[in-house]
């Protein structure tokens, strides 16, 4: 990957992180937003299922979310790396092009 492309990707990533902070964006979970929307739409709604286990605190919940994200990033990186390695192996093992003598 060229260094110019790497710089553009890095700048885009930084922009995705910084722009919401500068705009005063609020970081909230989708679960809370969904619960608010359901409560506004259907007052008195009672969920029909309960979680099997609730983490003891928000920090533990954040830890599990971060671990899940790290595991997902690892799997995606592993798949991309394996595919890239397989492509390089195929390229190295490809037969050399044959040249025919000119007549």
From Swiss-Prot:
It comes from the Bacteria. GO terms for cellular component: ATP-binding cassette (ABC) transporter complex. It is a multi-pass membrane protein. Pathway: Cofactor biosynthesis; adenosylcobalamin biosynthesis. Its main location: membrane. Keywords: Cell inner membrane, Cell membrane, Cobalamin biosynthesis, Cobalt, Cobalt transport, Ion transport, Membrane, Transmembrane, Transmembrane helix, Transport. It is found in: Cell inner membrane. One of its GO terms (biological process) is cobalt ion transport. InterPro entries: CbiN (IPR003705). Forms an energy-coupling factor (ECF) transporter complex composed of an ATP-binding protein (A component, CbiO), a transmembrane protein (T component, CbiQ) and 2 possible substrate-capture proteins (S components, CbiM and CbiN) of unknown stoichimetry. Subcomplexes composed of CbiMQO can be isolated from membranes but the CbiN subunit is not isolated in association with them, suggesting it is only loosely associated. Expression of just CbiMN in E.coli confers some cobalt uptake. Part of the energy-coupling factor (ECF) transporter complex CbiMNOQ involved in cobalt import. The complex confers cobalt uptake upon expression in E.coli; can also transport nickel with a very low affinity. A Cbi(MN) fusion protein has about 70% import capacity, but the holo-Cbi(MN)QO complex cannot be isolated, suggesting CbiN may destabilize it. Belongs to the CbiN family. This is Cobalt transport protein CbiN. It comes from Rhodobacter capsulatus (strain ATCC BAA-309 / NBRC 16581 / SB1003).
């Amino acid at each position: 990957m060229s260094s110019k492309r790497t710089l553009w990707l890095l700048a885009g990533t930084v922009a995705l992180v910084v722009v919401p902070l500068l705009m005063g964006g609020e970081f909230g979970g989708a679960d809370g937003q969904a619960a608010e929307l359901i409560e506004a739409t259907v007052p008195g709604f009672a969920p029909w299922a309960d979680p099997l286990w609730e983490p003891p605190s928000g920090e533990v919940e954040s830890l599990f979310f971060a671990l899940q994200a790290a595991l997902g990033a690892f799997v995606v990186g592993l798949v991309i790396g394996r595919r890239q390695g397989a492509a390089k192996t195929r390229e190295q093992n490809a037969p050399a092009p044959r040249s025919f003598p000119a007549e």
